[in-house]
Regions:
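Contiguous, small/hydrophobic- and glycine-enriched helical/loop subdomains that border
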Residues: 132-179
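N-terminal lobe of the biotin/lipoate ligase/transferase fold
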Residues: 2-149, 377-385, 392-399
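Short loop segments at secondary-structure junctions
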Residues: 87-88, 141-144, 180-182, 211-214
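Short, glycine-/Ser/Thr-/acidic-enriched flexible segments
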Residues: 80, 89-90, 214, 334, ...
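Detector for conserved single-position "signature" residues within domains
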Residues: 310, 315
């Protein structure tokens, strides 16, 4: 989501027609028993955790363990993070250098939101930013009744009930808000992603409510490496975005209300916490999502080139060095690396030593290129540029 604008603020109705009692947090055992019990056809869960890796692991557990004929609603809010699609390229989709600045020197860029985590989800779709001003919703149901608009429209109705009548689902299955007399007119407030298995289907999305970081979203989701990368992965579709100006709790209650209107009484309505991490399947999923092999190593094949070539004839930005660089990578590992220039900066045999290097484990491209035989003066120019473009300060292993 890109190109943020000012928030749309307004009064929020305080009362919702159906009253749901206050809920206490259930234990790990209670959660796993309730989720998997065959009699629990309609289930609703809200997470108190802000850990994106945990919440996505809970979501995956619900997808795998809930009864095949059940319908499940899961609501959660994450700490600041960028969540990108199963088949996306983080070097293409994310300004990794900016994330390094947020983590290592936030004052230099005026950032006060804490570290922004990078998360690869298990479903498809594009890259999105989450923070405390977003609520995420997931609906899991039988594939036979899956519809890309059905539950997006449920969320749009919830927003309408809270005084946002100009919300609707567009042709891309996104939830948008129309603002009369605004020069842009229509803003995206919610994007969705999907995962279908033989027995279950998942539709999940996020809704921009009161994000304090709206003006930073564009800078995080626009990679400086984009002009140089051609990928087989999925590209994000950028849209103007804005807040809708609703409190998280009111939004959650309204979505639960609409879910109840669609499916009737709940068999389960519970709150979960970090305790569910003690569940074996959730713990294993949590470890996988946090692993560098998952975040970076699942990247589809791509080519990085500083110059146009037959398969990617785009013009490149002007550089302050004349060396032509190109490498191919599979699963984040260099498959072939070439460097050409007037000074013959490195031999083919030397550059072949870069093959099998994991891009995300490189701490200094200058050092790598020097070791491969590139002249020190050339490597001193090319290396820092590559470090910057590829976000080495963020991707390299932390000490």
């Amino acid at each position: 989501m890109m190109r943020p604008n000012r928030s749309f603020l307004g009064s929020t109705p305080r009362n919702i027609s159906r009253h749901f009692p206050s809920l206490s947090t259930i234990s790990r055992r209670q959660f796993t028993d309730a989720a998997s019990h065959s009699s629990n056809k309609i289930q609703v869960y809200t997470s108190t955790s802000r850990d994106p890796f945990l919440n996505l692991s809970v979501e995956h557990h619900l997808l795998q363990k809930t009864p095949p004929e059940s319908t499940v609603l899961f609501l959660y809010t994450n700490d600041p993070c960028i969540v990108f699609g199963r088949n996306q390229n983080p070097w293409m989709e994310v300004n990794l250098r900016r994330l390094a600045q947020f983590r290592n020197d936030p004052a230099s860029v005026g950032w006060t939101g804490g570290p922004v985590q990078l998360v690869r989800r298990r479903s498809g779709g594009g890259a999105v930013f989450h923070d405390e001003g977003n609520v995420n919703f997931s609906v899991i149901c039988p594939p036979a009744v899956f519809d890309r608009n059905k539950h997006a429209e449920m969320v749009a109705r919830a927003l309408s009930s809270l005084g946002r009548p100009n919300t609707r689902v567009n042709e891309r299955h996104d939830i948008v808000i129309d603002i009369p007399d605004d020069p842009i007119g229509t803003y995206k407030i919610s994007g969705s992603a999907y995962k279908l298995t033989r027995l279950r289907s998942l539709h999940h999305g996020t809704c921009l409510l009161r994000s304090p970081n709206l003006t930073n979203i564009s800078g995080m989701l626009r990679s400086p490496a984009e002009p140089y990368i051609k990928t087989r992965g999925v590209d994000s579709v950028r849209s103007p975005v804005r807040n809708v100006g609703i409190e998280n709790a009111a939004f959650e209650a309204a979505v639960v209300e609409q879910f109840a209107s669609m499916y009737g009484n709940f068999d389960v309505r519970e709150v979960i916490s970090d305790k569910v991490l003690e569940t074996d399947s959730i713990s294993k999923g949590y470890e996988e999502l946090q692993s560098r092999d998952w975040i970076y190593g699942q990247t589809p094949k791509f080519t990085f080139s500083t110059f146009p070539y037959e398969e990617d004839p785009r013009e490149r930005p002007q550089l302050d060095f004349d060396t032509k660089l190109r490498f191919e990578a599979r699963h984040g590992v260099v498959d072939k690396f070439t460097a050409e220039g007037p000074s013959s900066p490195a031999s083919e045999d030397g550059l072949s030593a870069l093959t099998s290097s994991s891009i995300y484990n490189v701490s200094s491209w200058g050092a790598q290129l020097s070791q491969a035989g590139m002249a020190d003066g050339v490597a001193a120019k090319v290396g820092p540029w590559m470090d910057n473009i590829l976000g080495v300060d963020f991707t390299k292993p932390q000490q």
